Regions:
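Short linear motifs embedded in intrinsically disordered, charge-biased segments
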Residues: 1-152
Length: 152
């Protein structure tokens, strides 16, 4: 399942901007796959925690998306030339901003997961080993928060 389904589901995840509703959809899709694997329907009224316990696993899909995004961010921010992708990641496009509440930017996810400012995140990526460690901690934190939510 992880080889076939998750790779298709997370295709292009490096460029996603994740809000709470997308996070919930990722969790729901993962649980849907687990339920199909066990041939359990919602009519059976089984909790997500019991499904995860039976499979002896934790929710992992959101952590995979976090890892891909942070790895890609590190790769792009270390590039020397200033290209369009780096400009977009920095959140500095040209033109006027639209009305209403600002959309969640790519860098907002990075700041939330790493606990750094935008400038601090760009500086932290220069040391690849430290950035890998920070990415690993962010993935563990994302999976831990997900597991706690599943058990409630």
């Amino acid at each position: 399942m992880k080889v076939l389904v998750w790779t298709v589901m997370t295709y292009g995840a490096e460029g996603w901007t994740l809000r709470t509703d997308e996070k919930n959809r990722i969790h729901a899709a993962e649980m849907w796959c687990y339920r199909r694997l066990l041939n359990v329907t919602h009519k059976d009224r089984r909790t997500n925690a019991s499904i995860l316990e039976e499979l002896n696993t934790d929710r992992q899909l959101y952590g995979i998306v976090v890892k891909r995004k942070l790895s890609y961010f590190g790769h792009m921010s270390r590039k020397k030339n200033l290209n369009l992708t780096k400009t977009i990641i920095q959140g500095k496009p040209e033109g006027k901003r639209g009305k209403g509440r600002p959309r969640t930017a790519y860098i907002d996810n990075v700041k939330q997961w790493t606990g750094l400012s935008a400038h601090g995140a760009f500086q932290a990526t220069l040391d690849r080993d430290a950035w890998r460690l920070r990415t690993k901690k962010a993935v563990q934190a994302a999976n831990t928060l997900t597991d706690e939510a599943a058990k409630k």
